[in-house]
Amino acid sequence: VSSLGNKMDRSQAYEDIKDKMTGIMKGKLMMIGFYLRGPVGAPASNPAVEISSSTYVLHSADILYRNVYADFDPEVEKLGHFFTNIHSEGLNRAEDLPRARVFMDRSHLTTYSFNCTYAGNTLLMKKGNHRFAVDRAVYEKRAEQVAEHMFITGIEGPGGRITWMIGAAPSGCGKTTSAMAGDHFVGDDLAQCWIAEDG
């Protein structure tokens, strides 16, 4: 496992989380956002809660994800799960960076992030929740859904015909550039796909 993706025993991880997160939001405002990774009503969508003491994180989440406060409970009831994301920037001091951590608990569909402010490690619905979405597609919805690092775009042809394209590639290989070449841009990074009832 790379230094960016370490693995440890759950009990050891929880001890680290308790040690470093206990009281981390003291004197701060804890905010909670209710989001959906995908369209309301779609079988491959994933409801997610983001809990943070950072206005930057919640404001960014409101821009990047579907805020579904009114639809959250019905979606959870229908889909049978939701992802939980807990973050705090702590005191936001350079000396706390060695204590920064991001944990993913795949069994409990929960991510923890603390002592960091970088969007990739605080907007947990992207990286952390994508891991959970992949697990769900692979282990629970095999042959029904896919969660992948893909772009989706549509290119208009003669007579208004739209040819939909989907492409997978690792980071830094041109997904965004490829997706933006289309006339009907859907997404450039993470894709949730499913087979509709009509095939």
Question: What residue spans do the PLM features occupy?
Answer:
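Hydrophobic positions on the alpha1 helix immediately C-terminal to the Walker A/P-loop
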Residues: 178
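Conserved internal helical-beta-strand scaffold that buttresses enzyme catalytic cores
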Residues: 1-173, 183-194, 199
